[in-house]
Amino acid sequence: WIDPANRMACIQAGAVGRNIVTQLAVYGFTMGHEPDSVEFSTLGGWIATHASGMKKNRYGNIEDIVLDFNLVGADGTLSRRDINPRESIGADPRRFVFGSEGNFGIITQAIVKLFPLPEVQRYGSVLFPDFRSGVAFMYDLQHEGIPPASVRLVDNIQFKFSMALKPAKSGLAAQKSRI
């Protein structure tokens, strides 16, 4: 289910990231959690591995986005909780599940925060004369007070490696790129 008024959604743990992104966009929302593996990984996997996404600067990590979840324990018992406000006493056992890799049970679904889709998305690249200048830029950007949702600094070796991993174009796409 999706609750637009309270900006929450209940999503099955096996839902693949790319499908979550597409379905929430229909309603004008995003979870904001997009790890590098978003095309193939699942919500339950993100919780079990304590995943961090490319847009964590704006939306937070998975533990900041998940409000609650259902868990099937080793004895087959389904743990289901109501969404409650933060409690100020003792440890929060729900936090132990993040990064537990399934040791405390299997996550079956989660209730997550939703955010409105951004009005504008811009992508670009900046070249620096050396890596140190790039690090200085990243430092200044972080201290401006309004960090971008996603920013990444890569050196030339990493860039060349990632380009080498891209599949070669074929057919019409290959012909078009030669023009």
Name what the model sees in each region.
Residues 1-152:
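FAD-binding subdomain of flavoenzyme oxidoreductases
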Residues 149-179:
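Terminal amphipathic helices with adjacent charged low-complexity linkers/tails
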